[in-house]
């Protein structure tokens, strides 16, 4: 049976804006109050996904969340008509309104952690939505994320869906952005790397001082237990607290893996050699550890260009390619390194550049926009087929974006009651296009 790694990219929602909500995310904060273009953002993401589908990669799409989130605004005391709720919130608590209008669910690397059936004791694909408790605007996502994932991976014979972890900082969980998987072939049992920022229950353990560590060891271990992983399938690695304090808020900003390749910055982890040795013990195959030295790419350049927030994909030829943002081309040190990388003895033989600037300006590169799901042929057949990207779905989604999305949005526009109507009309139509059923609150 054939095995693949599918990518499920998040469709950018109609309220994509730059509100600077993510403390610890340098790009998000530095671009706060820019005028956004939701239509361009959605099309950039869709075009990147289609390009991968055209390369033969199994590519799916995940629906965005309903925003503005009036249900959260009502929970915190705003009342009256929908328009009045927005008006009150804009006047009395504009930062809370911004949080309830964020399109951050586009970054599906944070949607969930996924363990393929080759790794799990029950032989099913496991999904645990991330609780995202560290950021208010993301902490309101998990319940809807779970519904969207269940509507997408909708056959319980193959897919096991868990609830998100308890909503407490001790179990801070940011999903696949702090998780990668190494293996010989996608269908073989692999080693899942769980990267954490701190131990919540050990006050003496290292942790960052300036920015929060969003992922705890306790959360990572809980997900591994839920997913029925054996010790031989897991390696728990602490991210270097110093790089978190330099803006590396998720591990996918400083490292990325694919099959037998781990591509990472020399400052990415604590106890790097010890953990590499553990990976080698647990995974008996030829491995490529590509360590990028600070002398060639500084942490600042890595964060600014998102060198590591790239996708590494395996092409039909067996060679690997890096899917990079055009920002990597615009950074001389990073471009020089990537050109050098292609001359080294590794499986990576191509670098392909994509313009995802609308996402980049909010702190999310190509890797943020996708959730990786290693699957076999039967599992792919069991997925909701209306979520898999082909020419027909691409054209329908492109038309849908053109019809429903604005090409200009400011944070002041978030108080416009018309935005509620536009967003709900768009999502209602999308849920029919993708045959999702009633995944949104307004549909219940």
From Swiss-Prot:
Positions bound to substrate: 19-28, 110, 137-138, 214, 252, 362
Coiled coil: none
EC number(s) recorded for this UniProt protein: 3.5.3.23
Name of this chain's protein: N-succinylarginine dihydrolase
SUPFAM superfamilies to which the protein is assigned, alphabetical: Pentein
Cited PANTHER family: N-SUCCINYLARGININE DIHYDROLASE
Recorded superkingdom: Bacteria
Gene3D superfamilies: Succinylarginine dihydrolase
GO BP, one annotated term: arginine catabolic process to glutamate
Gene name of the encoded protein: astB
Protein family membership: Belongs to the succinylarginine dihydrolase family.
Top-level enzyme category: hydrolase
This protein's pathway: Amino-acid degradation; L-arginine degradation via AST pathway; L-glutamate and succinate from L-arginine: step 2/5
Active-site annotation: 174, 250, 368
Subunit annotation: Homodimer.
Catalytic activity: N(2)-succinyl-L-arginine + 2 H2O + 2 H(+) = N(2)-succinyl-L-ornithine + 2 NH4(+) + CO2
């Amino acid at each position: 049976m054939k095995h693949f790694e599918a990518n499920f990219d998040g469709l950018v929602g109609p309220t994509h804006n730059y509100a600077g909500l993510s403390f610890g995310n340098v790009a998000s904060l530095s671009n706060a109050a820019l005028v956004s273009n939701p239509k361009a953002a959605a099309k950039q993401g869709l075009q990147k996904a289609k390009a991968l589908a055209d390369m033969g990669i199994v590519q799916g799409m995940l629906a965005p969340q309903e925003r503005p989130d009036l249900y959260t605004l009502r929970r915190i005391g705003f009342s009256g008509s929908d328009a009045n709720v927005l008006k009150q919130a804009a006047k009395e608590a504009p930062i809370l309104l911004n949080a309830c209008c964020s399109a951050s669910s586009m970054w599906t690397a944070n949607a969930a952690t996924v363990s393929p059936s080759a790794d799990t004791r029950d032989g099913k694909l496991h999904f645990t939505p991330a609780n995202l408790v560290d950021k208010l605007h993301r902490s309101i996502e998990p319940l809807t994320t779970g519904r969207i994932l269940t509507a997408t991976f909708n056959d319980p014979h193959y897919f096991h869906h868990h609830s998100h972890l308890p909503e407490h900082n001790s179990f801070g969980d940011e999903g696949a952005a702090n998780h990668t998987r190494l293996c010989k072939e996608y269908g073989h049992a692999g080693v899942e790397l769980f990267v954490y920022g701190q131990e919540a229950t050990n006050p003496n353990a290292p942790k960052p001082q300036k920015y929060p560590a969003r992922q705890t060891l306790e959360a990572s271990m809980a997900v591994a237990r839920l997913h029925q992983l054996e010790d031989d399938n897991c390696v728990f690695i602490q991210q270097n607290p110093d790089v978190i304090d330099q803006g590396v808020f998720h591990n996918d900003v400083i490292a990325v893996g694919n099959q037998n390749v781990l591509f990472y910055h020399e400052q990415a982890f604590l106890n790097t050699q010890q953990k590499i040795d553990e990976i080698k013990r647990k995974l008996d195959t030829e491995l490529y550890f590509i360590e990028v030295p600070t002398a060639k790419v500084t942490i600042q350049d890595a964060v600014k260009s998102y060198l590591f927030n790239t996708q590494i994909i395996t092409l039909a030829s067996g060679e690997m390619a890096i899917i990079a943002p055009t920002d990597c081309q615009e950074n001389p040190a990073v471009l020089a390194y990537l050109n050098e990388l292609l001359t080294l003895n590794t499986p990576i033989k191509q670098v392909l550049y994509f313009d995802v600037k609308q996402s980049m300006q909010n702190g999310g590169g190509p890797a943020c926009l996708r959730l990786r799901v290693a699957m076999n042929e039967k599992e792919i057949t069991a997925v909701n087929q209306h979520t898999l990207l082909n020419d027909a779905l691409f054209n329908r989604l492109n038309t849908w974006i053109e019809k429903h999305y604005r090409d200009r949005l400011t944070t002041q526009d978030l108080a416009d009651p018309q935005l509620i109507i536009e967003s709900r009309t768009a999502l209602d139509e999308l849920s029919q296009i993708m045959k999702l059923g009633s995944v949104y609150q307004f549909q219940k």
